[in-house]
């Protein structure tokens, strides 16, 4: 047989779509005899790694491939090395009780976790509605007007708040930001990292004592503070506004159910995390951060923003709003470099709020506060000083000289407390804290329970306003209702469980169940990121293995896993280059060369590290114009910091001059940043650290199988050569990482999903990884050959080959017929497919990436759909249909529109089943959405109940 079908099959045979027979057909169609010949034809000889017995250079040190069963057993052994202690450390990370219906219905459900960012809103209405619920939840609890669709974590959300206030406060020329001295230490570190390249001066102050002297553009406060203290910031906000400053407050959303919302006392910005709303700590992540603003600042928001609009029939519909703020359009002038953040976790948090409702959240908060008050009362009864009388969940105990003794005593009882210094211990209570935990905590201090103490939320700070009154937070309080709601939403969306998602530059490959299974195991999921290292030897082994494997695969000398998105990897890599130049006395090296074809994130990241972007032209064939590059290098020889170059290029080809490009930059004293977005075309073939790169970020959510989650989570680790290693990210609470800049809230970023990539590499092995890469390239070339006569392939390499993706040029057809790339994308939904990437990197084109995971049947079905669409375009071109009324312009077609009055020149059958009745399809929930209407009439929270009538 072509493929073994027993459970003993090698994992690579489960992961790679085409079997032996299908692969032979693919190779025959593209004119090569083998995958090895394909490698020699597609990849420049100068960078191609040699292969011995099927194993490429660099990958020989990878362990032999494991079966799915053995990989899970190995992970279980590592999990068994960890200790699941009771975490009472706090600092923004808390144990939480995830409702099982959400674990099974979202986190373990491929209909949710294999979806992509909702760029095609008509087939993404389910997760867009869920994200609108998230935005409404955040807006309600913070008292703000507009919230975005998630941030990467709380600390980076604080940093984005800082830069947002500086942009928005046009009346202030001051570079100073006043920061609450009671802020979380990880947030303090991220703020310092982000502030320095931008020339922002951080001034720390105890806001309970008022504001410091002098001018400043903003104030950033924490509520409650890191010490647990609750402070009424009303006077601070009033004073700041009187002095022309804006105010951002980092507020705990569970506390906000009991404490007056910052928006109600005048805050301009709120930021924080939604982790404790049902999202496990996961040794640091992933969790959904949040950012909310007053309506006047909505166009300054970073990241995605879901808004309400209408479709072609006037029905309510959801879409991503105000996209012109973002890096993929505004490039170096964008509000931020972040793309999508933490959609999957935002949906969990939103559904947690829906499941519990306002009264349920309030009851949880009161229980948490009662536990903390019981701790405080017991300590005081034993004569131990409680530093703050006003707190929500965290008690600060003064134990002169005995902090570590107390922490050790608690540890012997299975509880992790936080030693603030030698004289103080913090005890943080959460949803999972029990009365038995309180008894053990007090025993560690030599105390015992004395009943709940006095109220610790002062009456003048108590919340009186309503929140979460929308039906989205009242209808789904039973498991039956929630189960059906989750199913109804997911049925509106195309994810990988329904069809291929051929998005170029996105690498929508299989997210195997065996890779995913461990993320909910408590030995990984219930670990606090600042837990003692003795609790997590298994997790640290996973991290160490993964760092070494990625070093082997990329050819670099060291890897950091801290960046929790590709954008953050870019930032960390460029920051390493900046600090390297500074250490060498080359402070004037601030120019970053970026090809005109680059993803907008590159330019946005360069600006964030204080670099000046100089654009390098591309040739008509898509390659970097080496003559223009040399001219730009000569022009900026003394100030050149780096070049950022994606390889293979964003045009989907292997540029044969890559080694010369790297050498030219190095000769001028610059560094080479090789963007790893397209690493799925390099693994096992060539290593950026060996063909000229000094640093790269990798996208574990593309190449290494972490799912996209509808728009996050992602992991963007960076690999560096040895001279940049001293500048890899550090962390104030993880001294083993060194003193480099902190780029994320947790030392190892989104650590709990690193087990996915560990499992993928462990199960594929060296030969499997190389086979996957070459199969992805073969499939892309097959599509290019099949579709070229219908939609010209815009760019190919020297041998007429593309890399792992190809660009289909529709511009001629649009000019001749008026049918646009948007029309084709929407029409594909009628055929049951998600559209390829539209108009990137070239307007008026579609970029197709099949990955290695799709079999030939699915690839052919996609090609057949595209060919059928071309025939429809020809009917428009011939005049049979007008450009205003044809199945492409009318797409997508809903079931509702088919049963309404029909006055189109094409049949209902052609509208609904253009591919015939055999292929199952997701019916679009709405017709084509009016984007301009949504931006003109910005609504970013759940519509009022009347809108549903």
Curated annotation (Swiss-Prot):
One of its GO terms (cellular component) is glycine cleavage complex. GO terms for molecular function: glycine binding; glycine dehydrogenase (decarboxylating) activity; pyridoxal phosphate binding. The keyword Oxidoreductase applies. GO terms for biological process: glycine decarboxylation via glycine cleavage system. Its cofactor is pyridoxal 5'-phosphate. InterPro entries: GcvP, GDC-P_C, GDC-P_N, GDC_P, PyrdxlP-dep_Trfase, PyrdxlP-dep_Trfase_major, PyrdxlP-dep_Trfase_small. The keyword Oxidoreductase applies. Its EC number is 1.4.4.2. Keywords: Oxidoreductase, Pyridoxal phosphate. It comes from the Bacteria. It catalyses: N(6)-[(R)-lipoyl]-L-lysyl-[glycine-cleavage complex H protein] + glycine + H(+) = N(6)-[(R)-S(8)-aminomethyldihydrolipoyl]-L-lysyl-[glycine-cleavage complex H protein] + CO2. The modification N6-(pyridoxal phosphate)lysine is found at residue 702. Belongs to the GcvP family. NCBIfam families: gcvP (TIGR00461), PRK04366.1 (NF003346). The glycine cleavage system catalyzes the degradation of glycine. The P protein binds the alpha-amino group of glycine through its pyridoxal phosphate cofactor; CO(2) is released and the remaining methylamine moiety is then transferred to the lipoamide cofactor of the H protein. The glycine cleavage system is composed of four proteins: P, T, L and H. This is Glycine dehydrogenase (decarboxylating). It comes from Rhodococcoides fascians.
